[in-house]
């Protein structure tokens, strides 16, 4: 799961992300997506690894027909020895742009691909009921190895 199309688009266009309305964010995402994929291509090609791009929305993973199509695409890419770079399709997504959360989409992609493991990297220490940086009432969820 990737992220950063809007941020890279803002950088290229010298825009402040906080001042963008939804429709402008979607346009900026399409500019930044090319920048993002170029960075991935440059990095992976150093190791002679082939990549592809898959742009999804949460709806794509939750509607049965589209979910099956996505699953088949992943399977075929794996068979072709390509590494799919997945990003939220911010050019058509709405709620995800507002909340900036790819975790649910990453979880759905892990389910679709029958992944053995999903590792979410974060700058937050722990698992919370909601984003503790935005919500003061966020509560830490205590886990034990039994839960994991």
Report the location of each language-model feature.
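Short, flexible, mixed-charge acidic loops at enzyme active sites
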Residues: 11-18, 133-143
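Short, active-site-adjacent cap segments at secondary-structure transitions
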Residues: 5-9, 61-62, 91-93, 125-129, ...
């Amino acid at each position: 799961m990737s992220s950063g199309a809007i941020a890279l688009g803002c950088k290229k266009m010298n825009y402040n992300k906080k001042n963008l309305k939804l429709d402008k964010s979607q346009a900026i995402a399409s500019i930044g997506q090319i920048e993002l994929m170029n960075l991935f291509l440059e990095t992976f090609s150093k190791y002679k690894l082939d990549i592809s791009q898959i742009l999804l929305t949460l709806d794509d993973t939750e509607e049965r027909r589209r979910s099956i199509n996505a699953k088949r695409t992943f399977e075929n890419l794996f068979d072709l020895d390509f590494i799919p770079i997945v990003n939220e399709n911010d050019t058509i997504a709405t709620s995800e742009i507002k909340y900036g959360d790819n975790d649910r989409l990453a979880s759905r992609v892990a389910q679709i691909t029958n992944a053995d493991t999903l590792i979410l990297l974060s700058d937050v220490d722990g698992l919370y009921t909601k984003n503790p940086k935005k919500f003061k009432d966020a509560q830490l969820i205590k886990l034990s190895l039994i839960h994991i």
